[in-house]
UniProtKB/Swiss-Prot annotation:
The keyword Membrane applies. The gene is UTR2. Disruption phenotype: Leads to increased susceptibility to cell wall-perturbing agents, defect in filamentation, reduction in adherence to mammalian cells in an in vitro adhesion assay, and a prolongation of survival in an immunocompetent mouse model of disseminated candidiasis. Glycans are attached at N65, N100, N125, N177, N194, N198, N202, N235, N239, N314, N327, N450. This is Crh-like protein UTR2. Residues 1-23 form the signal peptide. A lipid is attached at S440 (GPI-anchor amidated serine). Chitin binds at E172, W259, T270. The lineage of its organism: Eukaryota, Fungi, Dikarya, Ascomycota, Saccharomycotina. GO terms for molecular function: glycosyltransferase activity; hydrolase activity, hydrolyzing O-glycosyl compounds. Residues 441-470 form a propeptide. One of its GO terms (cellular component) is extracellular region. Residues 95-282 form the GH16 domain. Dual chitinase/transglycosylase that plays a role in cell wall architecture. Chitinase and transglycosylase activities are coupled. Required for the polysaccharide cross-linking at the septa and the cell wall. More specifically, transfers chitin to 1,6-beta-glucan in the cell wall. Plays an important role in fungal pathogenesis via its functions in cell wall assembly and regeneration, filamentation, and adherence to host cells. Acts as a cell surface antigen in acute candidemia patients.
């Protein structure tokens, strides 16, 4: 049985995008229950809130109203190689990001580092791993990545396109099977166990491979090392029951993740698909303190958008329409508009209908001074310097119930994980890095173990699991 990345990869990283609140304050959202006005934004995990809840992953279908979610920054053609420590440091902590995509091309929750000319994504002992997301959205294009997966039963690596209404195009790699990458797709989160296909390569852990997804209005093609391994035609996805094409068709972010599909807290079917219970006493855990995967390069070619797309704005300059916006909660391709509206929030209490971003000097963090220090990738500004008044979003670290377990172990002195230890002995001076950089691994641990989020973790996990079965 095959299970969706939506329900499990992101369930395993439940707290990565939105604010964790006390269990008594948690408000859920679904097709039968929309968010209230004071917590108007429905996260992709079915939890209502403000601030970061209204950014990437905000589901317009179940939010308070259509304007609760912020516009989605538009992606241009780019190429990025993580071939230096500075490139990895440009990846911004999710908790520092409030929607200004000129500030960073990538955000992360969990643990990232630089090693051997690559971005190293990590999953420490008894944690839920790491998610790296683009800050911009692609609406049709060709996306490719050169990577080495993790390994061992229960360990899952993923490279996906994922939209806010839960359209999804995947490459997934289960660690017990290193020769059969899985391609997959979903439309608006609808589970279909027949969508997955296997391909054949040599060892995905030992060797770099190039994986591509070529997404157009009419078809999706998957490639490995330049060879086409699968084609999906839109016409073959017609659903007579719903009277629509079950085909990914909405603007999507690029995401990489490393997560414990075989964690004992997961459903039995998830554990079986992932290759059994994860071994938290493995050689990698003993030697390094974490499982890991390498991302060497990522690139995207943005295709022309559909000719009949509507415009939300008065400008006659195409370049001013820098973001996508929905005009209906149906969430189909015909409901996508281009807009000139800002994509960032002024504070973590802001929402799409009250963004608090009228000040032209506002960035993703209100009351801060921003200075451009470098350029790279798909955006003009990828590295910034901010003053001490910087305000961060209430986004918790990349952990759930498993992290709470790790916290308990840490208090007894048995958890000796050092996220900056690096594979092969690379050690980074985390004390000298800024908390907004990917090199701040010690800060990431501090965030991960923050006592203020633990009270909401268990409730969030339970709600996420319940939402899957409903």
């Amino acid at each position: 049985m095959r299970f969706s990345t939506l329900h499990f990869a992101f369930l395993a990283t439940l707290s990565s995008i939105f604010t964790v609140v006390a269990a008594s304050d948690t408000t859920t959202c679904s097709s039968s229950k929309h968010c209230p006005e004071d917590k108007p934004c429905c996260s992709q995990f079915g939890i209502c809130g403000t601030g970061a809840y209204c950014l990437g992953g905000c589901d317009i279908r179940y939010s308070y109203n259509l304007t609760a979610c912020m516009p989605m920054p538009r992606m241009s053609t780019f190429q990025e190689s993580f071939d230096s420590k500075d490139k990895v440091k440009e990846i911004e902590l999710q908790s520092d990001y409030l929607g200004n995509s000129t500030e960073a091309d990538w955000v992360y929750t969990g643990w990232v580092d630089y090693y051997d000319n690559s971005l190293l994504i990590q999953m420490p002992n008894h944690t839920t791993g790491t998610v790296v997301s683009s800050t911009k959205y692609l609406w049709y294009g060709k996306v490719g990545a050169t990577l080495k997966t993790s390994h061992d039963g229960g360990v899952v690596t993923a490279f996906i396109l994922f939209s806010d209404v839960q359209d999804e195009i995947d490459y997934e790699f289960v660690g017990y099977n290193l020769t059969n990458p899985q391609s997959n797709y979903y439309s608006q989160g609808i589970l279909n166990y027949n969508n997955s296909r296997n391909s054949s390569v040599n060892n995905t852990f030992e060797y770099y491979h190039n994986y591509e997804m070529d997404w157009t209005e009419d078809k999706i093609e998957w490639y490995i090392d330049g060879e086409k391994v699968r084609t999906l035609n839109k016409n073959d996805t017609w659903n007579e029951t719903s009277n629509r094409y079950d085909y990914p068709q909405t603007p999507s972010r690029i995401q990489f993740s490393l997560w414990p599909g075989g964690d004992s807290s997961n459903a039995k079917g998830t554990i079986e698909w992932a290759g059994g219970l994860i071994n938290w006493d493995s050689e990698d855990i003993k030697k390094y303190g974490y499982y890991y995967a390498h991302i060497k390069e990522i690139y995207a070619t943005a295709y022309d958008i559909p000719n009949d797309v509507k415009l939300d704005g008065n400008s006659t300059k195409e370049s001013d329409y820098h973001a996508f916006l929905y005009n209906s909660t149906d969430g189909d391709a015909s409901n996508i508009m281009l807009t000139t509206k800002k994509t960032w929030l002024g504070s973590d209490d802001a929402t799409g209908f009250d963004p608090q971003n009228d000040d032209e000097d506002s960035s993703s963090n209100k009351a801060q001074e921003t200075t451009i220090t470098s350029v790279s990738g798909s955006s003009t500004i990828t590295s910034v310097k901010t003053d001490s008044t910087k305000k961060t979003a209430n986004v918790p670290a990349q952990n759930t119930a498993a992290a709470a377990q790790a916290t308990a172990k840490s208090s007894t002195g048995t958890n000796t994980y050092d996220p900056s230890a690096g594979v092969g002995g690379f050690v980074q001076d985390s004390k000298s890095t800024d908390s907004g950089s990917s090199g701040s691994s010690s800060q990431g641990v501090a965030n991960s173990l923050n006592e203020s989020v633990i009270s909401g973790i268990f409730a969030s996990i339970c709600l996420g699991i319940l939402s899957f079965f409903m």
